[in-house]
From Swiss-Prot:
GO cellular component terms given for this protein: bacterial-type flagellum basal body
Coiled-coil annotated residue ranges, if any: none
Kinase keyword on record: no
Disulfide bonds: none
Keyword match Acyltransferase: no
Organism: Sinorhizobium medicae (strain WSM419)
UniProt-listed InterPro entries: FliE
Name of the protein described by the UniProt record: Flagellar hook-basal body complex protein FliE
Family: Belongs to the FliE family.
Location in the cell: Bacterial flagellum basal body
First-listed, main subcellular location of the protein, grouped into a coarse class: other
């Protein structure tokens, strides 16, 4: 079920953005000192990792649910896995809402 989501190709857009961001991250050195700022990862990289973790969490919950149907997992394991997947999904929805709100606010700005 979740495999269909991965085939959409959203990760290719993240990789393109990441490649564009990596060329500009080299210019983040502190002026005058010659020392580079510590690399924390680009925004696209962080979002990509969060998306991958969310997908992994949902897949895990699906797997545990199937194990419970076969009688190989107990109810507590299923509930824990589903709650973790739900938390990941709610986080992804909240981030999406914030990004959309920021985009709409930028679109309303007068130039």
């Amino acid at each position: 079920m979740i495999d269909a989501i991965q085939s959409i190709g959203a990760f290719s857009a993240v990789k393109e953005t990441e490649a564009a961001g990596s060329s500009s991250s080299a210019s983040l050195a502190t002026p005058g000192t010659g020392a580079a700022a510590p690399q924390a990862g680009s925004f696209a990289e962080v979002l990509g990792n969060m998306t991958t973790d969310a997908i992994r969490s949902v897949k895990s919950a699906e797997g545990v649910s199937l194990q419970a149907i076969r009688g190989e997992a107990n109810t507590r394991e299923v509930v824990d896995a589903v709650m973790s997947a739900e938390q990941s999904l709610q986080t992804a929805i909240a981030i999406r809402d914030k990004v959309v709100t920021a985009y709409l606010e930028i679109a309303r700005m007068q130039i």
